[in-house]
């Protein structure tokens, strides 16, 4: 079971993804003037002399730049880079390949820390070419992956994920193999592949050491969120509800625990309240924010489906009471999801009764095939008309 005092087992927090989260918060209208968030972000910028990052930050957030601070940080950057270049030059003249590689790595890490993305990428790639040991090569690839996540550079992430997989197949150790799964899972969250994220996170719950990305409580929270939307009820029970490592952490995360157990225990009104809290948390999370509407909608459908599976018919009033909402709201919700083909039931408006009409899987597949075939045929016909013209 990972513990908070094992945080030193993580790689360096460079770049620090907390900075990306703070920057995201300040981009939201409701947090744009949040002095506490701005102070925390600027403290990190000053402490690390992040001149290149500060310039980009002021431009993206439309801040008035503190020219004196910028010049001070630029001077500190120039002095440190000069020192690092002198160390590299000395290593090239007087020392061996290992020392040269260490000096190159130190410069790359510094460029990464101050937010010089392009400079850091170039320096890490040069260092990679000088690196022989497989483990050290993988550590550089993890740096590139963190840079990719920090700036949400999809191409950088996908290319280096493949490179990391290839290196691990050559003989990467157990720790780095598991670490890569967490990196992949985090990126899967960012691109809305919740099913793959759940699989990767659940594989690493008991072996998590990637504290350079997030603390263990955040990791467990993410794991619960993606598992609830991705897993069927039996899998959720076996892998999450009965997961000793997850349950231990959930004692200190009561809101997340209530969200998980309220759905599993069919306490739907409590679940809807918890889902509203989760929605607000996701809006403020730099990875989940682009997907919060989709996530909340899918979880509502999931809850409605779970209740409807237990009955052949039930009244709108009963459903409204179960979910703690009004009859009009539940009527509109169900009508919308039925029309979209997401819920297999129909509403008897006269008697205010919901009747389930779940198709068997074969029939459903047949109907889907017919529907998609019709759409494809229409597109082919339109294309043929364009070509004939």
From Swiss-Prot:
Coiled coil regions in record: none
InterPro entries found in the cross-reference section: PCI_dom, Rpn7/CSN1, Rpn7_N, RPN7_PSMD6_C, TPR-like_helical_dom_sf, WH_DNA-bd_sf
Pfam entry (one): RPN7_PSMD6_C
Domain PCI: 193-361
GO cellular component: cytosol; proteasome accessory complex; proteasome regulatory particle
Keywords, sorted A to Z: Proteasome
Any one GO biological process: proteasome-mediated ubiquitin-dependent protein catabolic process
Similarity-based family: Belongs to the proteasome subunit S10 family.
Function according to Swiss-Prot or TrEMBL: Component of the 26S proteasome, a multiprotein complex involved in the ATP-dependent degradation of ubiquitinated proteins. This complex plays a key role in the maintenance of protein homeostasis by removing misfolded or damaged proteins, which could impair cellular functions, and by removing proteins whose functions are no longer required. Therefore, the proteasome participates in numerous cellular processes, including cell cycle progression, apoptosis, or DNA damage repair.
Known partners and oligomeric status: Component of the 19S proteasome regulatory particle complex. The 26S proteasome consists of a 20S core particle (CP) and two 19S regulatory subunits (RP). The regulatory particle is made of a lid composed of 9 subunits including PSMD6, a base containing 6 ATPases and few additional components.
Protein name from the UniProt record: 26S proteasome non-ATPase regulatory subunit 6
Organism field: Bos taurus (Bovine)
């Amino acid at each position: 079971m990972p513990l908070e005092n094992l945080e030193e087992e993580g790689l360096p927090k460079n770049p620090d993804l907390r900075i990306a989260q703070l920057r995201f918060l300040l981009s939201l209208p409701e947090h744009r003037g949040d002095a506490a968030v701005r102070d925390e972000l600027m403290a990190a910028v000053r402490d690390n002399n992040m001149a290149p990052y500060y310039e980009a930050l002021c431009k993206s957030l439309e801040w008035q730049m503190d020219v004196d601070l910028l010049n001070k940080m630029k001077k500190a950057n120039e002095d440190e880079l000069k020192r690092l270049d002198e160390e590299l030059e000395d290593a090239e003249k007087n020392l061996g390949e290992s020392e040269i590689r260490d000096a190159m790595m130190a410069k790359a890490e510094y460029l990464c820390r101050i937010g010089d993305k392009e400079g850091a990428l170039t320096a890490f790639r040069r260092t990679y070419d000088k690196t022989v040991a497989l483990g050290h090569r993988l550590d550089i690839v993890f740096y590139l992956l963190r840079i990719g996540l920090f700036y949400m550079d999809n191409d950088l992430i996908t290319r280096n994920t493949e490179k990391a997989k290839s290196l691990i197949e050559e003989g990467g150790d157990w720790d780095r193999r598991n670490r890569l799964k967490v990196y992949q899972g985090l990126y899967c969250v960012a691109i809305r592949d919740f099913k793959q994220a759940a699989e990767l996170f659940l594989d690493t719950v008991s072996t998590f050491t990637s504290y350079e990305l997030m603390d263990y409580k955040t990791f467990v929270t993410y794991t619960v969120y993606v598992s609830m939307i991705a897993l069927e009820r039996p899998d959720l029970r076996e892998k999450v509800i009965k997961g000793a490592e997850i349950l231990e952490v959930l004692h200190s995360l009561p809101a997340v625990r209530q969200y998980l157990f309220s759905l599993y225990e069919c306490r739907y009104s409590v679940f809807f309240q918890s889902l509203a809290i989760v929605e607000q948390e996701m809006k403020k999370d730099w990875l989940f924010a682009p997907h919060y509407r989709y996530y909340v909608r899918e979880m509502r459908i999931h809850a409605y489906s779970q209740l409807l599976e237990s009955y052949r018919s039930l009244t709108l009033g009963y459903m409204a009471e179960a979910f703690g909402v009004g009859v009009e709201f539940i009527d509109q919700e169900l009508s919308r999801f039925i029309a979209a083909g997401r819920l297999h039931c129909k509403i008897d408006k006269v008697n205010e009764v919901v009747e389930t009409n779940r198709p068997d899987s074969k029939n459903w597949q047949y109907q889907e095939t017919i529907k998609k075939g019709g759409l494809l045929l229409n597109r082919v016909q339109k294309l043929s008309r364009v070509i004939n013209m």
